[in-house]
Amino acid sequence: MAEKTYPMTLEEKEKLEKELEELKLVRRPEVVERIKIARSYGDLSENSEYEAAKDEQAFVEGQISSLETKIRYAEIVNSDAVAKDEVAIGKTVTIQEVGESEEEVYIIVGSAGADAFAGKVSNESPIGQALIGKKTGDTATVETPVGSYDVKILKVEKTV
């Protein structure tokens, strides 16, 4: 069975690698130490510190596993390989909802790099899916769970 690939920029992959290193070299040892301390309190059946530390350990190990998978199956996308005015991962897109005057700017990233607060939208998000492959001047229909709307692509540029 073919594994899912995770399209991302080189910068996104490097960020994931740093996050993984932090989890393995800092967070994991901290949790192991908390488990040791909690064990020293005696009876584990009513030891809330032990339970909390074990829960945190499971969470950290899950994050490590997820990051290792994303890094292992990362597909580095070179935005220079697509047309200058074509929307792709690694591009910054300025759009305007049809019938509205406000412009919105988004950076298209792989799912691992999505951060709505920083204006980074995943290629798998409704807006990302609608914009990928379109060019400056095109209109795209964004399909959301609550309905659809059209946006006009005003500008596409390489993200710095």
UniProtKB/Swiss-Prot annotation:
GO terms for biological process: DNA-templated transcription elongation; regulation of DNA-templated transcription elongation. One of its GO terms (molecular function) is DNA binding. InterPro entries: GreA/GreB_C_sf, TF_GreA/GreB_CS, Tscrpt_elong_fac_GreA, Tscrpt_elong_fac_GreA/B, Tscrpt_elong_fac_GreA/B_C, Tscrpt_elong_fac_GreA/B_fam, Tscrpt_elong_fac_GreA/B_N, Tscrpt_elong_fac_GreA/B_N_sf. Belongs to the GreA/GreB family. Keywords: Coiled coil, DNA-binding, Transcription, Transcription regulation. This is Transcription elongation factor GreA. PANTHER family: TRANSCRIPTION ELONGATION FACTOR GREA. Necessary for efficient RNA polymerase transcription elongation past template-encoded arresting sites. The arresting sites in DNA have the property of trapping a certain fraction of elongating RNA polymerases that pass through, resulting in locked ternary complexes. Cleavage of the nascent transcript by cleavage factors such as GreA or GreB allows the resumption of elongation from the new 3'terminus. GreA releases sequences of 2 to 3 nucleotides. Residues 1-72 form a coiled coil. Pfam families: GreA_GreB (PF01272), GreA_GreB_N (PF03449).
